[in-house]
Amino acid sequence: MKSVLLTRNIQENNETIQEINKYNLDLRYIHCSLIKYKTLDFNINILNNYSNIIITSKYAAHILADYNLKQDIWVVGNKTKQLLGKKVIYTANNIADLIQHFPTDLYKHTIYLSSNEITQDLPNKIARHIIYNVEYLNELPISIIQEFENIRYFSKPAYRNAFKANTIRATTAYKKVFNDPSLGSTYPLEVPLGKMSIDFILLYSQNSAKTLVRLLLQNNLLQYLQDSLVIAISLKVANIVRPFIKNVVYCDNQSPHDIIKLLYENAKI
């Protein structure tokens, strides 16, 4: 059974798993949430000064979904559009697409509601207001450290044979640790026992990629990912990890859905 390292927050990881399940792939999922979000106090009245709103993240859309917004809304991504409903007048594939189609005469009448971390600046005349903070992981969770310990231990055939020969250990340790059919099977070890690995790593932002590389370097773990395939949302994200991991592919149009397509194309091989 091949394994996938999921790097977004737990809610987004679970949504990703549901999308992957549509492709009927039998995968083991490893949760490593590199980011978490903190909603800030937000005075909705500041929007009264603007006729247009730009939203490029699903989390920002969640914050605004319960408000009766009167402005025209420009978004990135279909899921963001679904959260905000009929007031969305344009849905872009990515930020570059949105900027290309956004009328320049609306810049001074527009506010961009975002996090403290953005991957691409909008034109200067567009106002920006931060409505939530993105915080990145400072150390790897114990569960991820244990995952790499398993890879380290079972990378040597002699250790795998010793484990198989130990009947008590083989039957009592490393049992299934997650039993939710909607999320697929999660095992600390693959069954039947074989060489352990993390086969795929999904990366959705430059900051997540930088965080992952930093944590792997801190723990001297990059050597165990040289056979892994990183699937990045863009060329910029791919270029961050390429000096450290040799197998990297990326999406041409920066679409989260295309990450899953690339996963499917490589996992079925």
Curated annotation (Swiss-Prot):
A GO molecular-function descriptor: uroporphyrinogen-III synthase activity
UniProt xrefs under InterPro entries: 4pyrrol_syn_uPrphyn_synt_sf, RPE1
RPE1 insert domain: residues covered: 152-197
GO biological process, one term: tetrapyrrole biosynthetic process
Protein name, entry field: Uncharacterized protein RP474
Lineage: Bacteria, Pseudomonadati, Pseudomonadota, Alphaproteobacteria, Rickettsiales
